[in-house]
């Protein structure tokens, strides 16, 4: 009678159409704890590359898009909509209104502009900088062939609009914008604390959780 005699079987709630036997009650203090498997090597989404690093980043940061939980298709994240030019080269992202960092500082398109340029800066030594090579001028800038960050195909014409120009049409580009390397970092915190900005007492994200 394993099924019929299981305690609380009839009271189990349904989650996404399936009966769930865990607890749906919020933990005390709304603190979420989970196992990473290993300690993150790095906590800077623009620099990191490890699996545990990425899981950590997804808890604290959010990019322009997210992934549909069933299809993995791009869905709105920090950008609530976007347009693509007819030639597939220009992506215009429109950020959600009133976005803020976890410390209450406004988050704007200029944060994405700063963050993506930072990933491509050779001095940052980002392990995943090549993921941005689809962007016009990105590879030459990252490899030191070109020196002018203003020549990159990145622009923030106003606080809520972020424009990306690609070197060539890239069908999977929207999928990339959900990857942690493309997530924004808080310029005001990075510049205030340098490499120490990812310490627990300094780290500020824009995602669902605070650390």
Q: What spans do the regions from the language model cover?
A:
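Sec-dependent bacterial lipoprotein signal peptides
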Residues: 1-3
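Bacterial signal peptide processing site
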Residues: 6-9
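Immediate post-signal peptide segment of exported/extracytoplasmic ligand-binding proteins
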Residues: 21-33, 205
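N-terminal lobe/hinge region of extracytoplasmic solute-binding protein
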Residues: 35-86, 94, 202-209
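Sec-exported extracytoplasmic/periplasmic mature domains
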Residues: 61, 65-69, 100, 117-125, ...
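Gly/Pro-rich hinge or "lid" segments in bacterial periplasmic/extracellular proteins
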Residues: 69, 138, 148-151, 160, ...
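Aromatic- and charge-enriched surface segment that lines or borders ligand/interaction sites
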Residues: 81-131, 163
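Residue-level recognition of beta-strand termini and adjacent short loop/turns
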Residues: 86, 156-158
């Amino acid at each position: 009678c394993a099924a019929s005699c299981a305690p609380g079987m009839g009271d189990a709630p349904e989650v996404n159409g399936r009966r769930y036997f865990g607890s749906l009650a919020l933990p005390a203090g709304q603190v979420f704890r989970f196992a990473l498997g290993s300690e993150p090597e790095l906590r800077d989404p623009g620099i990191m590359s490890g699996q545990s690093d990425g899981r950590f980043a997804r808890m604290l940061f959010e990019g322009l898009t997210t992934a549909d939980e069933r299809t993995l298709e791009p869905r709105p994240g920090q950008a609530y909509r976007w347009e693509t030019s007819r030639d597939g080269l220009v992506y215009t992202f429109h950020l959600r209104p009133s976005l803020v960092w976890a410390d209450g500082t406004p988050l704007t398109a200029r944060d994405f502009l700063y963050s993506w340029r930072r990933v491509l800066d050779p001095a940052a030594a980002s392990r995943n900088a090549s993921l941005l090579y689809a962007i016009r001028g990105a590879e030459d800038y990252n490899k030191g062939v070109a020196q002018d960050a203003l020549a990159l195909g990145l622009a923030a014409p106003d606080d809520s609009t972020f424009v990306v120009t690609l070197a060539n049409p890239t069908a999977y580009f929207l999928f990339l914008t959900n990857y942690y390397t493309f997530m924004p970092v808080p310029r005001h915190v990075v510049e205030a604390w340098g490499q120490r900005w990812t310490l627990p007492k300094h780290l500020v994200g824009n995602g669902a959780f605070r650390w």
